[in-house]
Every structure is written in structure tokens, then in C-alpha cells.
Amino acid sequence: MSIRHFKYLNMWIIRAFLVYLYNKKNMQSSIMSDFVVYLKLEPYLSQWLHHHLGDPVRFPDGSNENAVIRRFLMKLPPGKKPDLAANDLTAICIPDSKAKPCSRFNHLGPRGKLAVKGVIEDLFRQNLWCDLRGITDAGSLSMKIQAWCEMHGIDEQSHEAIRQKYYRMRKAYSEKGIFLVHRRAKRTDN
């Protein structure tokens, strides 16, 4: 084997090893545990999460939601039993972490659950606002919200709650002088 062939062989071995290390690191960072926490959410939030993130809900790596979950995870207090699945509870996967291995840190206290619920509601509002903000100028907003619900896996019973949520968001800003929807000029035809 010539020196040139030896250099190419070494280069390929080093490259293969670096690819192996890169894949190993990325696989470890994206591992979600089989441990879950259960949250009581509004039905439309639960349906929306299941539609986009599966059941149990798995937030993307590096997401704000996973950061909040990790921040408030704690060991199960002595004498307390873990939460069990129920029809009205949403299962959310605990992200694995070197600092807080989920085999030991797999409990969210009441305030931790409120914090996670808060970031989920924020994410929902952002998605709702981003999707509907450009199409509210013309036509029936109610029909557009129904279509949005259908597109995001939310049943028809939740349509009215989501419509009211959207109107409350828009009204809160308009009361402060921030108009997020185009205002129409009044016609002055005689």
C-alpha cells in the first residue's frame, strides 16, 4: 500500500469516527424518557397537543417547554404516590437530562404543573394568533376559526371557547391603543 492510499484510508477512518461521534451525541440529546407527567388541561389544548406532538406529548429538543419541565422537576416526595393516568389528564414526556435523570427526577409539584401549563397556553396563543392574524379582515371570523380548529385536530365543541380567546386577545391590545387588525376607514359618501 502506498503512502497516498494510506493517507486516504486514515482520512476515511477519521471521518467515519467523527460521523459516529456526531450521531451518538445527537441521538443522546434527542432521547426522551418513558417517564411522563400528567397535566389537567382544557380539552382543546389537549387535542391540539396530541395532534401536533403525539400521545404522550413529546416537545422538541431544546424547546422552552422542555426547559420549564426540567427546571421544575423534582424527586417524588416520600410517602407520595406518582400521578396515574386518567381520561381528563394529558401525558407529557419528561426530557432526559444528565443533571436530572428522569429515573430519579420524575415529579412535578403543583406550581411546576402550573408553569408547564402556562408555557403550553402561551404556545397555543402564539400559534392561534400567527395563523389567524392575516385572515381576519374579510369574511366570517367564526368560520375561519372553525376551519382552524379542524386543521389543528380540535373538535367542534371547542370552537366557541377558541373564538372567545381570540377576541379577548385582540381586545386586550386594542384597549391599550395597539391595533393588531387593520381598521377600516369610515366611508364618507353622501
Language model region names:
Residues K165-L180:
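Short, basic alpha-helical nucleic acid-contact segments in DNA-binding proteins
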Residues L180-N190:
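Intrinsically disordered, low-complexity basic tails/linkers immediately adjacent to helix-turn-helix/homeobox/MYB/SANT
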Residues S2-L108:
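Long, low-complexity interaction regions most often at the N-terminus
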Residues C149-A161:
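Short, basic interhelical loop/turn and adjoining N-cap
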Residues K117-S142:
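Short, amphipathic alpha-helical "recognition" segments used to contact nucleic acids or chromatin
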Residues R133-H152, Y173:
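Short, charged amphipathic recognition helices of the HTH superfamily
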Residues C130, E160, Q164, R168:
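DNA-binding alpha-helical recognition surfaces that contact promoter or target DNA
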